[in-house]
């Protein structure tokens, strides 16, 4: 990385973010009835971190977090690990447009966030994950596309609801620029 390195704050966010992703993925997920496919709250947290720290942090939190989660359960499933990184990366690309650090996360920004996260999740779970499952693991197409569609839809909804609430709550803790005025005596 000639010239541009990650800040200490971002590196710490990646470490903590990956750890929280693992914990949420292991202990706060809901089975769907489709084999190896859960409703994951970890993607709402990944969206928050990607929005706050950008695409590199989002990609690394998703990738490292999913890798550790899989490694501590049934073993790494690389196609889905890669997609978690891709989803974090793509959501992170809008961090500069959303600027939630400035205390504003109104309807226009909520709409932009949800359009991007839904597009990122759809690309990742409806296309990339199933195709990689077929290429890497020779899994049957009908099985992996059903898993991808269920995972994608549940992640879109989870991030759309829980992710939006978390980001909006975070934005409310920030002072809007120009919201403070000097008192005259």
Swiss-Prot record:
Q: Which GO terms describe its cellular component?
A: plasma membrane
| Highest taxon of source | Bacteria
Classification via Gene3D superfamilies = 1.10.1760.20
Q: Which cysteine pairs make disulfide bonds?
A: none
Key words, A-Z: Cell membrane, Membrane, Transmembrane, Transmembrane helix
For membrane topology, the record states: Multi-pass membrane protein
Show the InterPro entries listed in the entry: ECF_substrate-spec-like, UPF0397
Q: Where are the transmembrane segments?
A: 11-31, 44-64, 74-94, 118-138, 149-169
Q: Where in the cell is it found?
A: Cell membrane
Protein family (similarity comment) = Belongs to the UPF0397 family.
- What this protein is called in its record is UPF0397 protein BPUM_3679
Its lineage reads:
Bacteria, Bacillati, Bacillota, Bacilli, Bacillales
């Amino acid at each position: 990385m000639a010239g541009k390195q990650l800040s200490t704050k971002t590196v710490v966010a990646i470490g903590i973010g990956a750890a929280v992703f693992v914990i949420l993925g292991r202990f706060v997920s809901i089975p769907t009835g489709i084999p190896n496919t859960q409703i994951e709250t970890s993607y709402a947290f990944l969206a928050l971190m990607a929005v706050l720290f950008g695409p590199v942090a989002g990609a690394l939190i998703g990738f490292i977090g999913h890798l550790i989660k899989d490694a501590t359960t049934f073993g790494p499933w690389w196609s889905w690990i890669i997609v978690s990184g891709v989803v974090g990366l793509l959501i992170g690309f809008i961090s500069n447009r959303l600027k939630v650090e400035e205390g504003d996360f109104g309807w226009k920004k909520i709409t932009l966030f949800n359009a991007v996260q839904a597009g990122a999740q759809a690309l990742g779970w409806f296309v990339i994950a199933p195709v990689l499952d077929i290429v890497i693991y020779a899994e049957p197409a009908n099985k992996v596309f059903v898993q991808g569609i269920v995972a994608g839809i549940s992640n879109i909804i989870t991030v759309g609801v829980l992710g939006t609430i978390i980001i909006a709550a975070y934005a409310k803790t920030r002072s809007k620029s120009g919201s403070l005025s000097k008192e005259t005596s």
